[in-house]
Amino acid sequence: YKQCHKKGGHCFPKEKICIPPSSDFGKMDCRWRWKCCKKGSG
């Protein structure tokens, strides 16, 4: 998956992706990332 930095593509806004902590006492690792671009017309 590539980040949406290309012009002319149909891209979605950023979404928050949360990754469970490796330890039981850790916090959720949440980061904002770009959704993937869809190919084709729409």
Swiss-Prot record:
Keyword Iron: no
Summary of subunit composition and partner proteins: Monomer.
Compartments it resides in: Secreted
Predominant localisation class: secreted
Tissue expression pattern: Expressed by the venom gland.
GO BP term, example: envenomation resulting in occlusion of the pore of voltage-gated potassium channel in another organism
Family: Belongs to the crotamine-myotoxin family.
CC annotations in GO: extracellular region
Keywords annotated in UniProt: Antimicrobial, Disulfide bond, Ion channel impairing toxin, Myotoxin, Neurotoxin, Potassium channel impairing toxin, Secreted, Toxin, Voltage-gated potassium channel impairing toxin
Chain's role: Cationic peptide that possesses multiple functions. It acts as a cell-penetrating peptide (CPP), and as a potent voltage-gated potassium channel (Kv) inhibitor, it induces severe muscle necrosis by a non-enzymatic mechanism and exhibits antimicrobial activities. It also elicits a short-lasting hyperextension of the hind limb. It does not cause observable tissue damage (whereas the whole venom causes severe myonecrosis accompanied by edema and hemorrhage).
GO terms for MF: potassium channel regulator activity; toxin activity
Disulfide topology: C4-C36, C11-C30, C18-C37
InterPro entries in UniProt: Myo_ane_neurotoxin_sf, Myotoxin
The protein's name: Crotamine Ile-19
Coiled-coil ranges per UniProt: none
